[in-house]
Amino acid sequence: MNQFLAALALVLLVCVGLCAQSTNGDRERLERVRAYYETAQRFERGGNWSEAEKVWRTVLDLASDDARAWTNLGVALSRQSKTIEAIEAWNRAIAIDPKLAGPYFNLGLNLVKSSQYKAAISPLQRTLSIEPRNEGARRALALALIGSERFQEATREIAQLLAQSPRDAGLLELAAQSFMRQNRYAEAVLVLRRRLDLPGATSHLWAQYGDALDGASRTPEAAEAYRKAVELDPASPLVRYGLGYLYWKLYRYDDAERELIEVLRLDPKDPRAAFTLGDLYLTKGETQRSLPLLETAATAYPNEFDTRFALGRALMLSGDSKRGVDELRAAVKNNDAIADGHFQLGRALLRVGSETEGKQELKRAEALNEKRRAGEAERFRKKLP
């Protein structure tokens, strides 16, 4: 009996010793992992991502089931443009701990940066289901939704962010972008006005504000916004063209001519400026001045109704009837649903002696006008009480 008790005591002592060794080994391993964490994070703060990668791999040699280490390894790989390996690391982290937000967030953010907007939505939504207050994830989700043309959902996400940060310039610009893509111009005007009241208003922002005002049928104010945009960036043909176009739209032809001439001085081959200025001259009866400009526009945009139509009219007025008919035919071919195209082509054909075809085109013009009038009458009838 005494021998049995002695043997049992020996076994227990051995077990206790082994447990103590195991506990001490685990404690030592944890201390080593903690030290490596600090080293890796120090490399990250210094932007030394290749060294950070090496340390995170060492951590994973010690603790292969450390989801946070896999997440951080993915970040280090991503910063070195090792995208495929980074995604693999984040997926490993997700497999180990599906309730950890970090790998979902980094995966979604990486997809947004590479313009894979639809694919980014799911991991970012998963991030927010785990961390509802993760502002970075919500911003990235808003971008992904805009990139996927899911504008109403994007607007809801941006609204939540703006509720917390109403003077955040980036969020206001993002909201404006979403509203503009939805043609919600009045709301775009409001958020852009708020953005312009903050520091750092750029020419681009003033131009975008002008576009929103014009979309909201506030064209005189839009022209003023574009004038400020031009003041901030006078060498931009794009911004100056926007101002010239708005002046043209407001029948301020002298102002429009001045701006459009300046656009063409900056960029002699700008087809939009050439078309608008050419159309302006055509409207003023200056056919010869309009022709070279409209030629430039028609060459640049051969499949547009407006460019071929305007050139056709100018050629007819200048006496080049054959080319005029050809251009008007091309315009109608580009869009045969515009009554004035058929009308002008019909008149041109009659002028060159093609009476039968000319009358057919005039009949098509009348039929389209009748269809338009009937549609307007029906819309009016539906509005009646």
Segments (PLM) and residue ranges:
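Structural signature of tandem alpha-helical TPR/SEL1-like repeats
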Residues: 45-58, 79-92, 113-126, 147-160, ...
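Alpha-helical segment of the N-proximal tetratricopeptide repeat
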Residues: 31-62, 75, 79, 177, ...
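Terminal, low-structured helical/coil segments at or just beyond the last alpha-helical repeat
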Residues: 23-24, 343-385
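Structural marker of alpha-solenoid helical repeat scaffolds
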Residues: 62, 96, 130, 163-165, ...
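Helix-start (N-cap) detector for alpha-helical repeat units in TPR-like alpha-solenoids
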Residues: 33, 67-68, 101-102, 135-136, ...
